[in-house]
């Protein structure tokens, strides 16, 4: 009974309406937070997952040891790797393809890699006109790694305490 009386008083006084109207007015006069892209950009987290890249060691040798863990863990089956042994007994990839159309950008490939060879870099602007351009081969992935290496290394360093 008491609950119904309280509800009737609130309804008659329009307290819910007044509260909602006050909140709307607060946001109406608050400073705008619109970012005019591409002239302005929001800060990006070091853990941001963008365009894929294959990294190299400072000596120029590619990091990938062809363990195929990234291919095995990929839930979308977007990664295809072929490898062959080298003269020194180590393995290196002869083919490393990522179908970016299938990729769900989950980051599992990056987490599985024991040598930090495959990473998801900071690049967000890789739109294309055709689907075929989204099939990345080894050369394109290595070019991405070379282009973004400084920023990728910095982001991995910032993320190191959480790994």
Swiss-Prot record:
Compartments where located: Cell inner membrane
Residues annotated as domain 4Fe-4S ferredoxin-type: 55-84, 94-123
Similarity-based family: Belongs to the complex I 23 kDa subunit family.
Catalytic activity as recorded in UniProt: a quinone + NADH + 5 H(+)(in) = a quinol + NAD(+) + 4 H(+)(out)
Gene Ontology CC entries for this record: plasma membrane
Names of the cofactor(s): [4Fe-4S] cluster
Cofactor binding remark: Binds 2 [4Fe-4S] clusters per subunit.
Membrane-protein topology: Peripheral membrane protein
Keywords: 4Fe-4S, Cell inner membrane, Cell membrane, Iron, Iron-sulfur, Membrane, Metal-binding, NAD, Quinone, Repeat, Translocase, Ubiquinone
Residues that coordinate or bind [4Fe-4S] cluster 1: 64, 67, 70, 113
Major enzyme class: translocase
Cross-referenced Pfam families: Fer4_7
Name of protein: NADH-quinone oxidoreductase subunit I
Binding site for [4Fe-4S] cluster 2: 74, 103, 106, 109
Assembly information from the UniProt record: NDH-1 is composed of 14 different subunits. Subunits NuoA, H, J, K, L, M, N constitute the membrane sector of the complex.
Physiological role: NDH-1 shuttles electrons from NADH, via FMN and iron-sulfur (Fe-S) centers, to quinones in the respiratory chain. The immediate electron acceptor for the enzyme in this species is believed to be ubiquinone. Couples the redox reaction to proton translocation (for every two electrons transferred, four hydrogen ions are translocated across the cytoplasmic membrane), and thus conserves the redox energy in a proton gradient.
Protein species of origin: Caulobacter vibrioides (strain ATCC 19089 / CIP 103742 / CB 15) (Caulobacter crescentus)
Molecular function, one GO term: NADH:ubiquinone reductase (non-electrogenic) activity
UniProt-listed Enzyme Commission number(s): 7.1.1.-
Example GO BP: aerobic respiration
Presence of the UniProt keyword Iron in the record: yes
């Amino acid at each position: 009974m008491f609950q119904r009386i309280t509800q009737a008083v609130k309804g008659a006084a329009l307290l819910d309406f007044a509260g909602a109207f006050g909140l709307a007015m607060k946001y109406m006069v608050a400073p705008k937070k619109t970012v005019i892209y591409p002239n302005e950009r929001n800060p990006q987290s070091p853990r941001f997952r963008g365009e894929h890249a294959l990294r190299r060691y400072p000596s120029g040798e590619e990091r990938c040891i062809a363990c195929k863990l990234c291919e095995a863990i990929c839930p979308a089956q977007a990664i295809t790797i072929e490898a062959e042994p080298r003269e020194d007994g180590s393995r290196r990839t002869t083919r490393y393809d990522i179908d970016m159309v299938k990729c769900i950008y989950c980051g599992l490939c990056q987490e599985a890699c024991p040598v930090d060879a495959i990473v998801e870099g900071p690049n967000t602007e890789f739109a294309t006109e055709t689907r075929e351009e989204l099939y990345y081969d080894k050369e394109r992935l290595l070019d991405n790694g070379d282009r973004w290496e400084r920023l990728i290394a910095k982001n991995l360093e910032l993320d190191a305490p959480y790994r």
